[in-house]
Amino acid sequence: MFLNYNKSIDEAEKIKNDLINKRFDNIKIEKKVVNEDPPLPFNLVKLQSYCSSHFGYNPADVMDITQSLRETHKAITYNRSDCQYLSEEHFKEAPKTLAQIVQNIKFKPSELDPTIHSKCFNDKNITAHFAIIPTNNKVDLNKLTEREKNVYLAVCKYYMAQFLPKAVKEKTKMTIELDGEYTLVAYSTVVLKKGYTAIFKDIKAEEVTELSSIADGMYSGTAIDARFEEKETKPPSRYTKATLNEDMTRIAKYVTDPEVKKMLLEKDKDKKGENGSIGTSATRSTIIDSLITKGYVAEDGKRLISTELGRELYRILPDEIKKADMTAKWWAIQEDIPVSYTHLRAH
């Protein structure tokens, strides 16, 4: 229950010995009720990540599947969107859309309420597009392939979640100050009301302990036992197609030049969910597949690994080309083109 990170074995052993049979008169219990919003509807990157983790589909496949759902079956809205928000006009259309979805998938959550106004309905966060949602067209699930059906149902579920109550949880935190030198902390969460989570079978259960049964306040007690776990730090996980695809939406975090980082972030200032990105929703999966096709990157199961050819190319490239900084500079040049063109036409 107690957490203590980055301690040597000797330090951990000392803390453990200090704790056993020690009397504490400063055990603080804090409780807080939290209302949890449903996840936003999908944009393409989020949908690709979801389908990778739940169905094993790679990003390019999801692009093709959503293209078919949109063009052939008229089942979903524009599929290459980089936005997770909807307009107030969409909210007005919700009763009709929900009624058709319920008819299409033969499922209606008991608490579904088209008058619930979730945070996804915000005109200020709309870009050139809006979130990927079901249309109000009739869709015959029997005419969809298994992959199309899985993706369509995921889009429906995330849209319907916007019209379900928030999940209500009670979070309990226990804090013990150890001689002013260490702080020991334990947490427990209990779900008071499932709300939207009732339709998400894949959500991990909250860790509930006896701590949740203790009321707010200060307590005294004696530690009867203590132990620690010895673990080694792990290197960052290798990318999969989906995680690389998603990380390309926030490449600015890898930029060290503050001016260039500012430029990248400025590029995406009106895009919720993208923070200094490279590529677009429509091109990122193609870029990744191109690296594989050209032999610079290979797949090891789901993991992506650099090839000898890729590492050699990286070695001989100029440092400037290797950095995300170049994307910001290219963007700045492209921004100047329309201005210059307009100036030329005016003269």
Regions found by a protein language model. Name each.
Residues 1-71, 103-104, 123, 141-278:
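Long, highly charged, low-complexity internal segments
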Residues 37-42, 64-75, 116-135, 286, ...:
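Core structural elements
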Residues 45, 60, 72, 78-81, ...:
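Generic beta-strand/beta-sheet core signal
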Residues 57-115, 306:
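Extended, well-ordered alpha-helical scaffold/bundle regions in very large, multi-domain proteins
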Residues 68, 87-88, 114-118, 168-181, ...:
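A glycine-rich phosphate-binding loop feature that marks nucleotide/adenosyl-phosphate handling sites
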Residues 80-98, 282, 286-290, 294, ...:
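Accessory beta->alpha helical hairpin/"wing" motif in late/C-terminal subdomains of nucleic-acid enzymes
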Residues 99-105, 312-334:
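Short, amphipathic alpha-helical interaction segments positioned at domain boundaries
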Residues 342-347:
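Conserved small/polar residues in nucleotide/adenosyl-binding loops
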